Amino acid sequence: MHFLLSRLLHHRQLNVSAQLFNVSHYDVITDMSNTFTCLKEILNAPSYPSNKVDQSVVEIVVARLTAAIRETGSIESYAAELVDVLDEVLRHPMTTLNEKCQDVDSPHCKIASDLLSSLFLHYGNKPVMTLTIPVALKCLNSENGELVKNTTSYISLAAIHNGKSLSSHALQIISNVVRGNYSLIRVLPHIYPDNKEPFHAQLSQLIDLLQNTEVDCSEKLSLLQLSSMVANTKPDVLIPFLPRFDVYLLSPQMSTALLNIYMSLISQNRTKSLSQFLPTLKLAAQSNEFINNRTTICKIIANIGRVSSPLASEAVDELVLMARNNSSDQQILQTVLNEIDAIGSIHPTSLRRHVSFFQTLPTSRIIERILAHLNPNNSENIMSYDIKEQSTESLLSKNSKVFGNLITSGGRTVFEVCDSPTVELCELDRNTHSLAMQYQNNRSSGSLSRRSHASIAHSLGAGTHGPYSDINESRELSMISMPSSSRTNVLLAQPTSSSTSRIQTLPHAFAPQAMTQIQMGKDGRVRPVGGGRRPVQWPAGSTETTFPAHLGPITTSKMCALNEEDEKWINNDRNDVVYKFVEHRKNKIRRYIGEVNARFPVPVQCTVEGSKNSKHRMVIHFSCQTRSSPCCVFTKEYLFAFKTKYPAFWLHFMFLQMECSAITQFGEVVGKDSQQYQTLEHCWKCLPSSITKSVPFDTMITAAFPNSKDQNKLIKELDEAGFFACFTMDSTNNMWNCISCTNPEKVKYFVEEGGAEKVLEGQLKEKKGRWRFLKRWNTKYFTLSSAALNYSTQHMPTDSRALLPSIDLRSIRSVRSLGRGKKARKSLRKAFEIFTADNTSMILKAKDEKNAEEWLHCLQIAMAHARRELA
């Protein structure tokens, strides 16, 4: 113990207190155990409450000790001793009577407050809080109101990081809340996940506090948050208390929290318990105070409508009213129509009274589906072919369209994920949709019989028979199963046309080798009853190549070209983990992708390159999103590509972009069984385990979205790859454009007559070949035209000397800037590099960075024009 502390504690020499604060912190904390022992002796003395000198000594020593501990960062070493002193102090009264017989803070209360303040200063330090919280909770039972208030604030702060430590004292905290310490209500949601049983037992008393006028709005919101957590874990405990919540649905401050409770109950299949609150939900839907919650209210009403036919009619009435009142808001209108379609697939009779309203809406896919529910005998309208209105393309021609989007480059073929942030998914195939609608209306007929290939061909060409004579008798369907790896089905409808209709027959290669029984699910989807699938002999010319490449050489496998129109409707299973993840985060994904696209675009495709003995790397590809220029640099046939160090982030973004496009265009989610999802998953599986860390693809994409720090890594990678030298963001349409589309005035030199003349000329320094770093720069005079890049050894060539073509623009594979990116390229700020088809490269350096950028842009536009002329 320092001698000044000894004089102060043992001899009560208050005159050394000023010198004590000038002593080094490390000298003060020496022999701390003896110091605390002396403090406890003084605090426990019977004369302490009345001895002013002892009180001053203790206050000075405690202040000096806590300051030394704080400044030296040794709280973990001395927390136990500080807590021990606090425990000794709390054994004494916290209030005392003054001369006016009023309750005031006792001397012990002042020391307790100082110790609590010092300990809870480290509320994020779990070892310290583990020791402090059990003793601090004793303060809640004190008769000193100010001490209880301060302790409550400390515990509320500590609960953010120490919910598990507090959870063992859940019953004590709940008891304090019920007795009137309402500020502790904010703590309850933090400790519930680690100790649920006390909350379930005391839930009735906690919910009663919602009606207490002394509980403020923020505390009531915490109670509703707690109720939502209970609804997610043990909904049956909460359901009896739901009538107490109904009044708060019309409160602007509390409606959002209550709607979250309802959504939690719906996710737990307790929708039926919400039917009694439909009148209040309708009032909320019609009020302008809840305009931000209309989408959520719409979904809740629709889920209630699926419970029974009477509720369906009532729900549809309200949803139609919402559609009328929100016709100008396309997002809400799309959500309402999707929910009406979902109700109509289960209770089609609920839609009949609103048929005139649906017919007044603009024609779209969702309106067609709703109108299809309205006609109980719609088989003829849906299944027959109208030559004037419907396409007469055969199944083979539709399949061939799919492969028009395949990109072939060298020895590999890659498949596009999406084209741009606003790319649309293909519409549902009419035949498949018609078949689903027919079997929805006839789902009571049970299992469907099988039909031979001959009968299929006969029914497809049955133009002279009465409409659906075969279907009305046997209600048969043929189903061709894809190979098991694709997990998709192709449904063949049976159109019966009039005498003027064109007869279509299936090629022999499309003969199904095994038929599969199907059934209609509650959501209106046609699915197999069960059993395995057998492979089918597909046409020899139909191929599909998925990216990335398989381990080893890149190969192309034979498979049926599945029409993307069918993909939306096939096996969209509600038990799909990915489906559920996206379904509950639609708006969040749309907002997130919108923010990301403002910083950088999402790749349109990816490949994995590497052989058996080489390192596998993922290559990502970008294209111009506008393509407004006739010389667009980066089109479907020529993409900007580079190898990435962060495949997980890029695949995550590609997945979110895929879902965002589907949600925006159709209001639906792309599930795990879709071809787009499986393509991305296959790319992930082909990466080595050193990159994937053996994490499943669905686990990776359902994790937290990449944060701003992760996005900054990708922006830096794009910068190093020269992306921002080739693309710019167009703020007017929120798209990333190539140089040609951003600067259309530069394109006219290439596309107008006389474009073969000089476009750009000047002196550049050049290096080429191997070991370039050992060579000197050679100054040459370059001339760029729409056909070639020419150069001469003359500094200023005369008109009589023609420049010989040096590099044909059609032979240039790529050109990139060396002025951005890695620090090692600081000396090449004014340079750019050209790669040719014969695997040679040339580095050219301009007089300044602006001139180098001009050469780079003109070269890119000239290359695009040359490729276009060659095509």
Swiss-Prot record:
Keyword Secreted: no
Gene3D superfamilies in the record: Pleckstrin-homology domain (PH domain)/Phosphotyrosine-binding domain (PTB) (2.30.29.30)
Domain observations: The PH domain is required for membrane targeting.
Species in which this protein is naturally found: Caenorhabditis elegans
Major site of localization recorded for this protein: membrane
Subcellular location: Cell membrane
SMART domains: PH
Protein name: Protein melted homolog
Gene Ontology cellular component annotations, sorted alphabetically: plasma membrane
Membrane topology per record: Peripheral membrane protein
Alphabetical keyword list: Cell membrane, Membrane
Record Pfam families: PH
Transmembrane intervals: none
GO biological process, one term: regulation of signal transduction
Family per similarity comment: Belongs to the MELT/VEPH family.
PH domain boundaries: 757-864
GO molecular function: phosphatidylinositol-5-phosphate binding
